């Protein structure tokens, strides 16, 4: 499939945070956003994910299994700074909610909850309340959401911030596997995460200028 952003611009108050942002990604490709704090990286990710409405421009998807009625966000997973998991529910209940709520992209199937737990290195504890877990364990299970409901585009905002090297290595393997299966990754991250060959988009804030590398 193809993910295309055309001339995106987002305003905060009277001023644009950024404008005229365009890019196109196809199967197996990744784009990493760089730039200083406040340059609009998180805002761009949230806009592409459909969580913020752009002042100008649009995001579109095209490819096999995509019809005219499908919203682009139906092809996306968004993993931001928050885990988006209920502390009073068990891990299994949380993952079941996201598996059912998000659903799978047409033609693909997510992995079982127990399998996802094993992949993120935490097999055997999905019966525990999410709130009982350490911060690192909670973050790993938030990453498992990417696995239980299969979607081709991963939008990642500093997904491994403050985690240890083992978690970084685990998530790097997940990202590489996703790209190897033809997935697409759009990320703001200071960690390599298997994205060394990714395209780069430098955000410059109010200047509205982007630089490809």
Curated annotation (Swiss-Prot):
EC number: 7.6.2.5
UniProt: ATP binding residues: 35-42
Annotated membrane topology: Peripheral membrane protein
Subcellular location per the Swiss-Prot or TrEMBL entry: Cell inner membrane
Alphabetic keyword roster: ATP-binding, Cell inner membrane, Cell membrane, Cytochrome c-type biogenesis, Membrane, Nucleotide-binding, Translocase, Transport
Keyword Protein biosynthesis (UniProt): no
Any one GO biological process: cytochrome complex assembly
Catalytic activity line of the entry: heme b(in) + ATP + H2O = heme b(out) + ADP + phosphate + H(+)
Xref: InterPro entries: AAA+_ATPase, ABC_transporter-like_ATP-bd, ABC_transporter-like_CS, ABC_transptr_haem_export_CcmA, P-loop_NTPase
ABC transporter domain location: 3-211
Domain of life per record: Bacteria
Transmembrane segments: none
UniProt family annotation: Belongs to the ABC transporter superfamily. CcmA exporter (TC 3.A.1.107) family.
Identification of the protein by name: Cytochrome c biogenesis ATP-binding export protein CcmA
Gene: ccmA
